[in-house]
């Protein structure tokens, strides 16, 4: 946007403002010094919690379509309502959002995401058609199919509930750090984004969404790239949480074993606490007995994670024999055989089949190498 700047009056300036609450002025001249200039009743709108445009909203939004995003953002951040005529104009002008750069839209989306209750913003975005232009993948979650009298839940409203649960957890002692709080909200928004592409009907099970976590994780990179969100560690963090978000739930649905928790901690690494927060937020079942069972099992998972952390899980879960030693021992270059042997040792440690000590791991390594036709003397 490159507006033409011209000299003008205060009235001209106020007419160009996006919303009445931003069109307030204080007189600095003469005997009117300090007087509030409020030609559009902006103070009243502030008091009543209303977002409205000073002039015809179609003109206001046409002048700068990003104002539609700002309208939703202010309503979300301030918990205000959008004035009916202004709200209707959002739908009429939604298509003009296409001329706005992805970076500017992403900036507004991040501000909506960081609001106390971002789901309010997504209600406005969805109902006005703006969301379809920004995140059509999210709109697909609002499609509910019924077959043989069996319908799956509305995954769009479930997603917003999970997002609100994550926001509510921000005040808890185990909440994520300020640096990651925005991105765990994005992970909550995208945690089920792969469900429409994975949806299948089974005559026995009904609707299934197998592998939706992996499909969704792959979608994250494409969405971040399109939305001009950062393609760095932040994106990978969101990807990881989306990919792993079913793991704690699967563990909590059965007997919580040491092996499963060790593998989970190994895969999640330093993001294990954020993953657990997201997964607990994902339990939105209306069946209180089932919900209580999940939460109790999550408590057990957290206890086992805490125990691993106290015992320095990074050292415990990383085999003391590494790839360099394997290559040197068997006179091998970097190759598939080295990777296979490393994985054998890793699995044994994660499953607690052998202690992470040199002697028992060496015995296991030699046994596997012999079956692969490898020897210390000759290598391959």
PLM segments and residue spans:
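Catalytic cores of the polymerase beta-like nucleotidyltransferase superfamily
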Residues: 1-380
């Amino acid at each position: 946007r490159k507006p033409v700047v011209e000299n003008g009056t205060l009235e001209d300036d106020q007419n160009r403002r996006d919303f009445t609450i931003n069109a307030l002025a204080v007189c600095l001249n003469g005997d009117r010094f300090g007087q509030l200039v409020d030609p559009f009743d902006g103070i009243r709108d502030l008091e009543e919690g209303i977002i409205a445009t000073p002039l015809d909203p179609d003109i206001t939004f046409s002048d700068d379509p990003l104002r539609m995003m700002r309208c939703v953002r202010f309503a979300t951040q301030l918990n205000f309502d959008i004035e009916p005529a202004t709200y209707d104009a959002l739908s009429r002008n939604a298509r003009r959002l296409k001329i706005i750069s992805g970076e500017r839209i992403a900036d507004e989306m991040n501000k909506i995401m960081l609001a106390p209750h971002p789901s309010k913003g997504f209600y406005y975005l969805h109902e006005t058609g703006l969301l379809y232009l920004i995140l059509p993948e999210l709109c697909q979650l609002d499609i509910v199919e019924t077959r043989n009298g069996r319908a799956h839940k509305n995954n769009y409203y479930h997603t917003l509930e999970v997002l609100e649960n994550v926001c509510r957890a921000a005040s808890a002692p185990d909440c994520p750090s300020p640096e990651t709080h925005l991105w765990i909200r994005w992970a909550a928004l995208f945690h089920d984004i792969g469900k429409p592409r994975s949806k299948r009907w089974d005559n026995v099970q009904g609707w299934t969404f197998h592998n939706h976590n992996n499909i969704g994780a792959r979608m994250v990179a494409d969405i971040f790239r399109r939305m001009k969100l950062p393609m760095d560690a932040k994106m990978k963090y969101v990807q990881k949480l989306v990919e792993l978000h079913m793991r704690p739930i699967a563990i909590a649905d059965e007997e919580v074993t040491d092996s499963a928790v060790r593998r989970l901690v190994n895969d999640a690494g330093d993001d294990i606490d954020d993953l657990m927060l997201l997964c607990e937020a994902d339990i939105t079942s209306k069946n209180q007995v089932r919900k209580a069972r999940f939460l109790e099992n999550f408590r057990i998972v957290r206890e086992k994670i805490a125990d691993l952390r106290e015992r320095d899980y990074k050292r415990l879960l990383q085999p003391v024999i590494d790839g360099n030693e394997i290559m040197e021992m068997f006179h091998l270059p970097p190759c598939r055989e080295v990777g296979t042997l490393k994985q054998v040792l890793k699995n044994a440690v994660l499953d607690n089949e052998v202690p992470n000590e040199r002697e028992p791991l060496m015995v296991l390594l030699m046994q596997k190498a012999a079956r692969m036709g490898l020897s210390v003397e000759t290598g391959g």
